Amino acid sequence: MLGLLDDIVASRSRISVIGSMNVDYTVTAKRLPKPGETVNGGPLTLLPGGKSANQASAAARIGAQVQMFGAVGEDANAAFLLEHLRDAGVDTSHIAAVAGPSGTTVITVDANGENTIVYSAGSNGEVSVDYVQQSSDALVAADVLGLCLESPMETVTACARLCHDAGLKVLLNDSPFVAELPAELIEASDILLVNEHEMAQLLDIAEPDDDDWDGLDWSDVARQMHDFGFNQAVITLGGDGSVVIDGDDIYRIAPVVVEAIDTTGCGDAFMGTVLAGLASGHALSDSAQLASYVSAYAATGFGAQASYGTAAQIRERFGAK
């Protein structure tokens, strides 16, 4: 399976990602606070993040050619974000600079690597439909487009439509979760990526009381997903792997088990890898299987982009698999 990494590099696969770039203000604690509670934490760490920037970085670090689209503010955080994207190998030449602060998140990570995240859009909220139109030639110079919902909905929808009409495969990450997606966005998106809880909310499916997602009727989930408008979807199950719906086929992707230090950004590493796999011509199920390795590697480090591995590092960590 790790041989797919060679294909990603050799194919010179091209990816456009539009969306969020944030500075993550991260603190560790023994446990996450309950509502109204204060707990002691460790030192505050500033790390590069943002769902879209994370996805772009993960794809670039394993060898894909990635263009990032979006906006940073006019503050010290802007240079910090751009520097880290460039270090990962991401093309930042189309990123705009707007007045005001860059995007930020406040993250708390507990001793088990679980986290809570609060997001402040900042410059990400200023990415407009006009910007999409001005960047259209560069946006469509790719094989796939990655989207999340940390940018204005009208901007995301316009970009999806532009790229879909140009023949790109469009992968939509419904996160931060929106239950009622615009019909035009659904129509213009080829693949949906959500976690198990987002899937349950989206399709109004009861979550299993024992958290046994393997006991779910995935054939029924696939039928409902098709009815919703997606013939292809990936449902991530955290540390339990993922499920891929590809037309009439359902694939259960096993997890890659590691001792997690911090799960921040693991879902984004997963999506970035799926983007890279699709851009290099691989099936959705194979791309998701490779993504299990890349996201597992990310869980063994601290932070989002800071924990992402190169193709060589991932091969070394997991061996010939």
Show the residue positions of the predicted features:
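Conserved phosphate-binding/catalytic region of the ribokinase-like
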Residues: 2-15, 179, 210-321
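Glycine-rich phosphate/adenosyl-contacting loop at the front of the ribokinase-like
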Residues: 1-71, 76-80, 87, 260-261
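Conserved phosphate-binding/catalytic loop of the ribokinase/pfkB sugar-kinase fold
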Residues: 71, 97, 107-144, 149
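Short gly/ser/thr-rich secondary-structure transition/capping motifs
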Residues: 88-89, 125-130, 170-177
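A glycine-rich helix N-cap at a beta->alpha junction
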Residues: 84-99
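Conserved beta-alpha-beta core of the PfkB/ribokinase-like small-molecule kinase fold
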Residues: 144-220, 240-242
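A short, aliphatic-rich alpha-helical micro-motif
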Residues: 139-140, 185-186, 227
